[in-house]
Amino acid sequence: MKSLKEEIQKLAADLNIQKIGFTKADDFEYLRASLIEQKEAGHTSGFEHKNLDERLQPKLSLEDAKTIISIGIAYPNKAEEKPEKTEYRRGSFSRGSWGEDYHHVLRRKLKELAEGIEKIAGDFNYTAMVDTGALVDVAVAARAGLGFVGKNGLLVSKEYGSWMFLGELVTNLDIEEDQPVDYGCGSCTRCVDFCPTKALLGDGRLNAQRCLSYQTQTRGVMPEEYREKIKTVIYGCDICQVVCPYNKGINSHFHPEMEPDPDLTNPELLPLLDLSNKEFANKFGNMAGSWRGKNPIQRNVVYALGNANDRSALPKLHDIAENDVRDYMVDAAEWAIEKLENKHRMRPRKR
């Protein structure tokens, strides 16, 4: 007769969940000093859960919590189809935004997992968390044995590298815990060395304010030092994953809903500037990269056009510089125009 843990492991495999692990719902108190230090240093993004105690104490999310079930689903990092060539230059979304928004996919998986467990074990108390939940997902996953926290701050496993999305069920079930893995980064510092903004601190933490992924998600004017560094990426950044040796040769295609549509993940840049809010939502709204709305994306498109040396964009950029009511778009257009025409700006830049 299979144990409850074995039954849940089989259920997870049947649900196409690539990694599952179990850890006690004990506090993550060892993170407290580091999280406080990061906030005081100005290294946080502002997207983190606000209540520090809730980030560290699972029982504040579920009073009778005993076991946390951590899951990872692997996603593709190489597209099987390329976008067709057109008259327009294309940009790109990072791989974490390919296909359907991973928050939706993970929530469905956790719901299916919880419903399956109920059929096995009867009613139980649980709360599901994905990305924006209270707990630190990578810390939960590492303690549950899914992998280790790399120097890039991401969860890394031998089977799937860091190309995994994480979520967890905090439950009142009593299940034997798994042990952390016995491998790690060793002396490798490739992610730290290749980060173009030196955002990685080298110990698994980062200065989120310097991370290009964060910068592409901000609203308003992007500081000038990051504009050329994003190249033609209009959302996110994958550099610290692409250079990781654990990711070499890995490309997972388990979930059809996460396969990229090349016209969305590598969109034509210039036409994107003419999309209304509704048109943007209709076209890109199912992607994780759309969560901040069209404005940051359109700003990034302007930077990308400048970086791509796309002089065909100059009429549109001049129109934005002269007529757009959004100050950050005017600023971006003037920057791109100067880059393309090598002229002085019309007015001082905001920094």
Swiss-Prot record:
<feature type="binding site">
    <location>
        <position position="244"/>
    </location>
    <ligand>
        <name>[4Fe-4S] cluster 1</name>
    </ligand>
</feature>
<dbReference type="GO" id="GO:0006400">
    <property type="term" value="P:tRNA modification"/>
</dbReference>
<feature type="active site" description="Proton donor">
    <location>
        <position position="131"/>
    </location>
</feature>
<keyword id="KW-0671">Queuosine biosynthesis</keyword>
<dbReference type="Pfam" id="PF08331">
    <property type="entry name" value="QueG_DUF1730"/>
</dbReference>
<dbReference type="GO" id="GO:0005737">
    <property type="term" value="C:cytoplasm"/>
</dbReference>
<dbReference type="GO" id="GO:0051539">
    <property type="term" value="F:4 iron, 4 sulfur cluster binding"/>
</dbReference>
<keyword id="KW-0479">Metal-binding</keyword>
<comment type="pathway">
    <text>tRNA modification; tRNA-queuosine biosynthesis.</text>
</comment>
<dbReference type="Pfam" id="PF13484">
    <property type="entry name" value="Fer4_16"/>
</dbReference>
<keyword id="KW-0560">Oxidoreductase</keyword>
<protein>
    <recommendedName>
        <fullName>Epoxyqueuosine reductase</fullName>
        <ecNumber>1.17.99.6</ecNumber>
    </recommendedName>
</protein>
<feature type="binding site">
    <location>
        <position position="211"/>
    </location>
    <ligand>
        <name>[4Fe-4S] cluster 2</name>
    </ligand>
</feature>
<feature type="domain" description="4Fe-4S ferredoxin-type">
    <location>
        <begin position="177"/>
        <end position="205"/>
    </location>
</feature>
<dbReference type="InterPro" id="IPR017896">
    <property type="entry name" value="4Fe4S_Fe-S-bd"/>
</dbReference>
<keyword id="KW-0004">4Fe-4S</keyword>
<feature type="binding site">
    <location>
        <position position="185"/>
    </location>
    <ligand>
        <name>[4Fe-4S] cluster 1</name>
    </ligand>
</feature>
<keyword id="KW-0408">Iron</keyword>
<comment type="similarity">
    <text>Belongs to the QueG family.</text>
</comment>
<keyword id="KW-0963">Cytoplasm</keyword>
<feature type="binding site">
    <location>
        <position position="195"/>
    </location>
    <ligand>
        <name>[4Fe-4S] cluster 2</name>
    </ligand>
</feature>
<dbReference type="GO" id="GO:0046872">
    <property type="term" value="F:metal ion binding"/>
</dbReference>
<dbReference type="GO" id="GO:0008616">
    <property type="term" value="P:queuosine biosynthetic process"/>
</dbReference>
<feature type="binding site">
    <location>
        <position position="240"/>
    </location>
    <ligand>
        <name>[4Fe-4S] cluster 2</name>
    </ligand>
</feature>
<comment type="function">
    <text>Catalyzes the conversion of epoxyqueuosine (oQ) to queuosine (Q), which is a hypermodified base found in the wobble positions of tRNA(Asp), tRNA(Asn), tRNA(His) and tRNA(Tyr).</text>
</comment>
<keyword id="KW-0411">Iron-sulfur</keyword>
<feature type="binding site">
    <location>
        <position position="237"/>
    </location>
    <ligand>
        <name>[4Fe-4S] cluster 2</name>
    </ligand>
</feature>
<feature type="binding site">
    <location>
        <position position="188"/>
    </location>
    <ligand>
        <name>[4Fe-4S] cluster 1</name>
    </ligand>
</feature>
<dbReference type="InterPro" id="IPR013542">
    <property type="entry name" value="QueG_DUF1730"/>
</dbReference>
<dbReference type="GO" id="GO:0052693">
    <property type="term" value="F:epoxyqueuosine reductase activity"/>
</dbReference>
<dbReference type="InterPro" id="IPR004453">
    <property type="entry name" value="QueG"/>
</dbReference>
<keyword id="KW-0819">tRNA processing</keyword>
<feature type="binding site">
    <location>
        <position position="191"/>
    </location>
    <ligand>
        <name>[4Fe-4S] cluster 1</name>
    </ligand>
</feature>
<dbReference type="InterPro" id="IPR017900">
    <property type="entry name" value="4Fe4S_Fe_S_CS"/>
</dbReference>
<comment type="subunit">
    <text>Monomer.</text>
</comment>
